[in-house]
């Protein structure tokens, strides 16, 4: 088992310097490799989208990292208002990604469990 699995895991909101790593995660699968543009420098559209996410109180872009500050994965949460239960929020979990170095070690499950508790 990878040593990183047992280290402290930190879930935090993404910051602008994370954008290249997030795009790299998004591009690292069959579909993402066809739709994402992971070329340095990144297109401004990624930075514009990030700013829109940050400014929207119903959006959270989350990073999972270990105590060595290695990015293990990411996800986006969208909070959607609804009327049932006298009004409230439900969340949509999307763009869950795990770095290929950490796949097959249970991190995707940890990300989803964290998001559900959130």
Spans of features found by a protein language model:
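Glycine-rich phosphate/pyrophosphate-binding loop shared by adenosine-nucleotide-utilizing enzymes
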Residues: 9, 69-74, 91
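Conserved GNAT-fold acetyl-CoA-binding loop/helix
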Residues: 27-49
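Conserved acetyl-CoA pyrophosphate-binding loop and the N-cap/start of the following alpha-helix
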Residues: 102, 106-114
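A short helix-loop-beta-strand connector motif used in the catalytic cores of GNAT acetyltransferases and
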Residues: 51-63, 92
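Conserved donor-binding loop and adjoining core beta-sheet/short helix segment
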Residues: 75-94
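Conserved beta-strand in the GNAT
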Residues: 63, 70-79, 97
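A short, internal acetyl-CoA/4′-phosphopantetheine-binding micro-motif in the GNAT/acyltransferase core
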Residues: 65, 81, 93-103
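A short beta-loop-alpha structural element at the N-terminal edge
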Residues: 10-24
């Amino acid at each position: 088992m990878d040593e990183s699995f047992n280290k402290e895991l930190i879930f935090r909101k993404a910051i602008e310097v994370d954008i290249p790593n997030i795009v790299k995660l998004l591009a690292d699968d069959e579909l993402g490799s066809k739709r994402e543009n992971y070329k340095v420098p990144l297109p401004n559209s990624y930075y514009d989208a990030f700013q829109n996410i940050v400014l929207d109180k119903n959006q959270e872009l989350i990073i999972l990292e270990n105590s060595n500050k290695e990015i293990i994965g990411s996800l986006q949460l969208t909070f959607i208002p609804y009327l049932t239960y006298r009004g409230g929020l439900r969340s949509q979990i999307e763009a869950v990604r795990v770095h290929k170095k950490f796949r097959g070690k249970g991190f995707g499950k940890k990300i989803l469990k964290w998001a559900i508790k959130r």
